[in-house]
Amino acid sequence: MNKIILVALITLSVSAVRAQQGNFQQPSVEDRVKNVHQKLDSAFKLEPSKLAKADTAFAVYYRGTDKLRQDLMSGGERPDMQVMREKMQPLTDTRDKELQTILTPEQYESWKKEVEPLLNQRRGGRPRQ
Protein backbone atom coordinates (compact mmCIF):
# COMPACT_ATOMS: atom_id res chain seq x y z
CA MET A 1 0.00 0.00 0.00
CA ASN A 2 2.79 2.43 0.91
CA LYS A 3 4.59 1.62 -2.34
CA ILE A 4 1.48 2.45 -4.35
CA ILE A 5 1.07 5.79 -2.59
CA LEU A 6 4.77 6.56 -3.09
CA VAL A 7 4.60 5.75 -6.82
CA ALA A 8 1.46 7.87 -7.18
CA LEU A 9 3.12 10.83 -5.43
CA ILE A 10 6.26 10.56 -7.57
CA THR A 11 4.18 10.38 -10.74
CA LEU A 12 2.14 13.40 -9.66
CA SER A 13 5.29 15.36 -8.81
CA VAL A 14 6.96 14.60 -12.13
CA SER A 15 3.79 15.56 -14.01
CA ALA A 16 3.52 18.85 -12.12
CA VAL A 17 7.15 19.73 -12.82
CA ARG A 18 6.86 18.95 -16.52
CA ALA A 19 3.69 21.00 -16.80
CA GLN A 20 5.51 24.04 -15.41
CA GLN A 21 8.59 23.80 -17.60
CA GLY A 22 6.96 25.45 -20.58
CA ASN A 23 8.78 23.38 -23.22
CA PHE A 24 5.80 23.69 -25.51
CA GLN A 25 6.50 22.33 -28.96
CA GLN A 26 4.24 23.69 -31.68
CA PRO A 27 2.52 20.86 -33.58
CA SER A 28 3.73 20.45 -37.16
CA VAL A 29 1.92 22.14 -40.03
CA GLU A 30 0.65 18.74 -41.15
CA ASP A 31 -0.77 17.98 -37.69
CA ARG A 32 -2.52 21.35 -37.51
CA VAL A 33 -3.94 20.93 -41.03
CA LYS A 34 -5.14 17.44 -40.10
CA ASN A 35 -6.88 18.89 -37.02
CA VAL A 36 -8.64 21.56 -39.11
CA HIS A 37 -9.52 18.96 -41.76
CA GLN A 38 -11.26 16.82 -39.13
CA LYS A 39 -13.16 19.80 -37.72
CA LEU A 40 -14.28 21.00 -41.15
CA ASP A 41 -15.30 17.50 -42.20
CA SER A 42 -17.28 16.84 -39.03
CA ALA A 43 -18.93 20.27 -39.03
CA PHE A 44 -19.79 20.64 -42.72
CA LYS A 45 -19.34 17.23 -44.45
CA LEU A 46 -17.55 18.86 -47.39
CA GLU A 47 -16.75 17.17 -50.68
CA PRO A 48 -13.20 15.79 -50.90
CA SER A 49 -12.21 18.44 -53.47
CA LYS A 50 -13.34 21.24 -51.15
CA LEU A 51 -11.55 19.66 -48.20
CA ALA A 52 -8.37 19.48 -50.29
CA LYS A 53 -8.67 23.20 -51.12
CA ALA A 54 -9.20 23.99 -47.44
CA ASP A 55 -6.19 21.85 -46.51
CA THR A 56 -4.06 23.81 -48.97
CA ALA A 57 -5.32 27.15 -47.65
CA PHE A 58 -4.53 26.17 -44.07
CA ALA A 59 -1.12 24.72 -44.96
CA VAL A 60 -0.16 28.02 -46.63
CA TYR A 61 -1.54 29.94 -43.63
CA TYR A 62 0.29 27.84 -41.02
CA ARG A 63 3.59 27.91 -42.93
CA GLY A 64 3.28 31.68 -43.25
CA THR A 65 2.51 32.21 -39.57
CA ASP A 66 5.34 29.89 -38.54
CA LYS A 67 7.82 31.81 -40.71
CA LEU A 68 6.56 35.16 -39.44
CA ARG A 69 6.71 33.99 -35.83
CA GLN A 70 10.24 32.69 -36.36
CA ASP A 71 11.33 35.97 -37.99
CA LEU A 72 9.84 38.04 -35.17
CA MET A 73 11.41 35.90 -32.46
CA SER A 74 14.85 35.73 -34.10
CA GLY A 75 15.79 38.98 -32.37
CA GLY A 76 16.18 37.07 -29.13
CA GLU A 77 13.35 38.74 -27.26
CA ARG A 78 9.64 38.08 -27.18
CA PRO A 79 7.83 40.27 -29.75
CA ASP A 80 4.89 42.45 -28.86
CA MET A 81 1.67 40.47 -29.32
CA GLN A 82 -0.10 43.41 -30.95
CA VAL A 83 2.67 43.73 -33.56
CA MET A 84 2.57 39.99 -34.18
CA ARG A 85 -1.22 40.07 -34.58
CA GLU A 86 -1.01 42.98 -37.04
CA LYS A 87 1.62 41.23 -39.16
CA MET A 88 -0.39 37.99 -39.20
CA GLN A 89 -3.63 39.71 -40.23
CA PRO A 90 -2.90 39.61 -44.00
CA LEU A 91 -2.29 35.85 -43.74
CA THR A 92 -5.58 35.44 -41.89
CA ASP A 93 -7.42 37.59 -44.43
CA THR A 94 -6.05 35.53 -47.34
CA ARG A 95 -7.04 32.30 -45.61
CA ASP A 96 -10.54 33.62 -44.89
CA LYS A 97 -11.04 34.76 -48.50
CA GLU A 98 -10.09 31.28 -49.68
CA LEU A 99 -12.50 29.73 -47.16
CA GLN A 100 -15.30 31.98 -48.43
CA THR A 101 -14.86 30.45 -51.89
CA ILE A 102 -15.00 26.93 -50.42
CA LEU A 103 -17.83 27.28 -47.90
CA THR A 104 -21.36 28.56 -48.39
CA PRO A 105 -22.12 31.88 -46.65
CA GLU A 106 -23.99 30.00 -43.90
CA GLN A 107 -21.12 27.56 -43.43
CA TYR A 108 -18.59 30.39 -43.32
CA GLU A 109 -20.64 32.21 -40.68
CA SER A 110 -20.82 28.99 -38.65
CA TRP A 111 -17.05 28.55 -39.12
CA LYS A 112 -16.32 32.04 -37.74
CA LYS A 113 -18.70 31.71 -34.78
CA GLU A 114 -18.31 28.08 -33.73
CA VAL A 115 -15.38 26.21 -35.29
CA GLU A 116 -12.60 28.81 -35.52
CA PRO A 117 -12.79 29.76 -31.82
CA LEU A 118 -12.18 26.09 -30.94
CA LEU A 119 -8.98 26.13 -33.01
CA ASN A 120 -7.75 29.25 -31.23
CA GLN A 121 -7.99 27.81 -27.74
CA ARG A 122 -4.77 27.33 -25.85
CA ARG A 123 -3.98 24.37 -23.66
CA GLY A 124 -6.14 24.52 -20.59
CA GLY A 125 -9.20 25.68 -22.52
CA ARG A 126 -8.46 29.42 -22.53
CA PRO A 127 -9.16 31.15 -25.84
CA ARG A 128 -6.35 33.25 -27.31
CA GLN A 129 -6.64 36.97 -26.89
Where are these regions (language model features)?
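Charge-rich (acidic/polar
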Residues: 20-129
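Bacterial Sec-dependent N-terminal signal peptides
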Residues: 1-25
